[in-house]
Regions:
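Jelly-roll (double-stranded beta-helix
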Residues: 1-210
Length: 210
């Protein structure tokens, strides 16, 4: 079986930043911080810190205009992997933030004593510690949190703006320029089955990890 999970997580931008220059960065798996917590029964939970500090673990630097880079955004993306029988407490978020626990692997997770269904998203109280327990098997979950922008959202296909007029303009821009110019001859270029890991940045710099 294919045990690969892919998540496409979108962070909205404030209206003032909707038209900033695009930016790309790569978070290599070996560079992403991980925190390990062992409970009283000897079970170790691993928290992968993709965004938002956890204990003393600081995440990698997000793109400069990302909402995650703004002071006070309270953005966190944590991947929590727990073996059967493990217990772990997560620190509170801000009182104005939204926090969701997405259980995507396993079905024996308790949140503060309440059993939640597998493959489900669960909104939790943000500003108190969160106690997670893997009661009947190993589980994996995403913790997603952040302070809402409190701005209108207009969305159509892959376009997310603040007003319908901005959506129409974004579609026109795409039709005219293909996201600023598509340099490849096909819509689905690839690098072949033998190409190792690499990242090509807008300034021409290439990172290779093999």
């Amino acid at each position: 079986p294919n045990d690969l999970h892919l998540f496409q997580i979108w962070l909205n931008l404030p209206s003032s930043d909707k038209l900033v220059d695009p930016y790309f960065t790569m978070f290599w798996t070996e560079d992403i911080p991980r925190v390990r917590r062992t409970d009283a029964d000897g079970h170790t939970t691993e928290i992968t810190v993709i965004a938002g500090a956890f204990d003393d673990a600081e995440p990698l630097t997000p793109p400069p205009d990302s909402w995650a880079a703004k002071p006070g955004s309270d953005v966190a993306i944590w991947h929590v992997a727990m073996p059967a029988g493990a217990h772990v407490e997560l620190p509170p978020a801000g009182s104005e933030s939204a926090r969701v626990v997405y259980l995507f692997e396993g079905d024996g997770l308790e949140i503060d004593g309440h059993v939640i269904a597998g493959n489900s998203g669960n909104v939790v109280v943000p500003d108190r510690e969160l106690e997670l327990s893997a009661t009947s098997g190993s589980v994996e979950a995403l913790i997603l949190q952040g302070r809402p922008l409190a701005e209108p959202v207009a969305q159509y296909g892959p376009f997310v703006m603040t007003t319908e007029a901005e959506i129409r303009q974004a579609i026109l821009d795409y039709q005219e320029t293909g996201f600023g110019g598509w340099p490849w001859e096909t819509d689905d270029p690839h690098h072949g089955p033998t190409q190792g890991r690499f990242a090509r940045h807008a300034d021409g710099r290439v990172e290779e990890k093999g």
